């Protein structure tokens, strides 16, 4: 009798999993994501201290498209003689992602996204004088711009997704480079 209960429970788990699989990408379904962000320059050296973290919120629309909003913190180190000058960016983003292709079960999807960006950049912890007496001409600035990117999403279960993307941001207002490519990897929980 206990063996029958165990087998019944296992069968119900598999049955529930296959039924729930059809409930992916429902309109108005929401998701929270946490991603690690690496600038393209981080891949050119064997080890890099450049990084970023992104917290996102998404709301599904029709046909696998969705609106998304995010807050992102980035830190890059620019070498100067024997020093590294930190540049930190706090960026808010809002945009829309269009489903390009996916398999029939919606387990794997490729999306194209576009976002508007607004943020603030802090150079060397707001200190313009370096230890060797040099003066930084770069200043703290407000940033604004746009970002486009391709993202691959893969469902691990009915509620968890793995996200991998490549993006290029154009940020005006900064005294550093205008175009900033990056790669992200993260997890999203759908509810």
Residues of each region from the PLM?
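Gram-negative (and chloroplast) outer-membrane scaffold detector with strong preference
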Residues: 56-131, 160, 189
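Extracytoplasmic loops and strand-loop junctions of Gram-negative outer membrane beta-barrel proteins
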Residues: 35-40, 79, 131-136, 167-170
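Outer-membrane beta-barrel "beta-signal"
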Residues: 179-191
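Short glycine/proline- and aromatic-enriched beta-strand/turn motifs that initiate or cap beta-hairpins
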Residues: 21-76, 188
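Outer-envelope beta-barrel architecture signal
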Residues: 24-32, 63-69, 106-112, 140-142, ...
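Acidic, glycine-rich flexible loop segments
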Residues: 136, 143-154
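Cleavable N-terminal export/targeting peptides
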Residues: 1-29
